[in-house]
Amino acid sequence: EDLRTPGLDKLLWVFLRLLYSHQGLTRFLDETDATALEKQIDKLEQRRSKLVQGNERLRKSLTDAIATTGMRLENLRNAERNAEFVSLELDRIQSKILALSEMAVNNQSPDFITSQVDAVAAGMAETESAIKELNYITGLGETLEEAPSILERSI
């Protein structure tokens, strides 16, 4: 049967974008060391506490360095939460795709399968919102927000 629908294209497109986001998040998390950032903050705070009165230029510089490193640490924490969400969403969508595939194998009504695909695709709003927030990692930007026609051939 022909199961090509915009809903299936959307489902597959979201899955591919999540895979790409997951790859970027994983690479970022592998390359960023929270312990090193925490140690850097401690060292900077120690240096600042040892400054003598009247050395405001150095104090401002160290304060800014502490704030910047703190932002990097917070960004790392956000990336950890995002990676967990993306991983859960990948598992969830993969399960949905498998369930839809199993329905198709069991020769259920194409109209029923299409309605199920469309229902799953319609429930992707939160996932798509998360993907938009992760555009800085995916590099996909706004240009490919709409799902392309992924399935151009009959299944």
Features from the language model and the residues they span:
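Long amphipathic all-alpha helical oligomerization modules
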Residues: L51-I155
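Membrane-proximal, non-transmembrane interface segments of integral membrane proteins
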Residues: E1-L51
